[in-house]
Amino acid sequence: MMSVDATASPVPALLATDLYRFYHAGDDETLALRGVSLAVEAGETVAVIGPSGSGKSTLLACLAGLDEPDGGMVHVAGVPMSRQSEAERARVRARNVGVLFQSANLVEHLSVRANVIASQQLARKVDRARVDTLLDRLGIADRAGARPSELSGGETARAGLAVALANEPALLLADEPTGELDSATAARVVERLKAEADRGAAVVLVTHNAELAAIADRVVELHDGAIVQ
């Protein structure tokens, strides 16, 4: 019988190893990521900062399985995200990853509640009670039946966050999550991000906002596609 090492370190919620990403435009080649490696533990919040064009959005897309790195590997909760079919990446993302975009990715013909439930259906673990609790905690329970076009900017942001959190993801990725929000909505979003880390999710924030970066346990700076600190 194989023995188990009780002292073995747990698998990081996110493990990205030696990521490279090239983009081609005619004869020109741009190296967007240069050997980026990043490990984020469960319950840890990491802020990724850097100037425009430094590779932050490309890195987030690769971590989410929305883009495929040309080199290196991404694992989420021990499951490979890279070198998989598009369908397999979508399956891993649905079950283990929440992505909060600066512009909420909502389906217009569905209500707010139906958008959140649809996210759960992708992961095949519908929990309507959790949906209602989540909408209540985000202060939009009274807008559950509204369509995205009927929401204010702050309500749209919170609905997008509800979709990202629908499946209690092991990894939450947020791209400028407070970028265009009023102070009250931004505070509510930050509160929820902290709560997810307290729950045990690994949280990665891509931001230019120093105040948002300050809530992170660790700050990683990208420059020309490489980590500089």
Language-model segment annotations:
Residues 64:
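Helix-to-loop junction immediately C-terminal to a conserved catalytic motif
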